[in-house]
């Protein structure tokens, strides 16, 4: 059997390691965004019933536009959003992949503040987007001024802010997001992504970048 290094792999991908996360049998697994409570029986029964109905049409492709899901997500998020403001995919990583495919690529730059989610540079590498890493410092905190300075200096096409940050848990104020949006608009006219994968686990789940979406067409929240 041929090994990967024997195949015509892109030079920039040779020697790279795939993303991975420990899969441990432990009561609380914070690194994978899991709920520690089991699914209630009545919820499980409802899911099973709906799956059974769906199986009757499994010979056909599902709705490619995910309209029912997008409408439900818009209702859940509020902030005046409609299904037209929502995109759905197979997890947040696929959404981020789509963003890099559309707005990154050769000759373009992506900036994030490290340490942060280790999947970001992997997606950047896969799309041949230059990765710019800016250190958060000793307490892992960010300020509007610090964010603005980094963006204006490097002029990235994509900026991702993770809130609360993975793996440090550091929250991010809305003032930081507003500063980042203003800076990237001035610097490159690029895209600002706020990754809120752990937003519901934050100290105040009501504080979300979703509230900043109206009027900011280059702001995306995943």
Locations of regions flagged by a protein language model:
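Short beta-strands and strand-loop turn motifs
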Residues: 31, 131-135, 158-165, 192-196
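Short acidic capping loops at alpha-helix termini that bridge into adjacent secondary structure
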Residues: 81-86, 107-109, 196, 217-218
């Amino acid at each position: 059997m041929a090994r990967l290094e024997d195949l015509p792999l892109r030079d920039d991908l040779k020697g790279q390691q795939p993303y991975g996360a420990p899969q441990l049998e432990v009561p609380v697994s914070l690194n994978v965004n899991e709920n520690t409570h089991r699914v209630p029986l009545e919820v499980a029964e409802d899911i099973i019933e709906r799956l059974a109905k769906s199986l009757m049409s499994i010979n056909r492709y599902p709705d490619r536009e995910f309209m029912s899901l997008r409408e439900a997500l818009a209702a859940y998020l509020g902030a005046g959003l409609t299904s037209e403001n929502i995109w759905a995919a197979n997890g947040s990583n696929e959404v981020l992949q789509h963003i890099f495919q559309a707005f990154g690529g050769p000759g373009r730059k992506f900036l994030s503040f490290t340490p942060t989610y280790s999947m970001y540079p992997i997606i950047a590498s896969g799309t041949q987007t230059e990765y710019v890493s800016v250190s958060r410092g000793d307490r892992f905190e960010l300020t509007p001024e610090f964010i603005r300075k980094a963006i204006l200096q490097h002029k990235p096409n994509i900026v991702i802010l993770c809130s609360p940050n993975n793996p440090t848990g550091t929250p991010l104020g809305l003032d930081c997001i507003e500063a980042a949006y203003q800076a990237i608009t001035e610097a490159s006219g690029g895209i600002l992504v706020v990754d809120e994968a752990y937003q519901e686990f934050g100290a105040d789940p009501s504080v979300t970048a979703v509230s900043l979406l109206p009027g900011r067409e280059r702001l995306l929240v995943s």
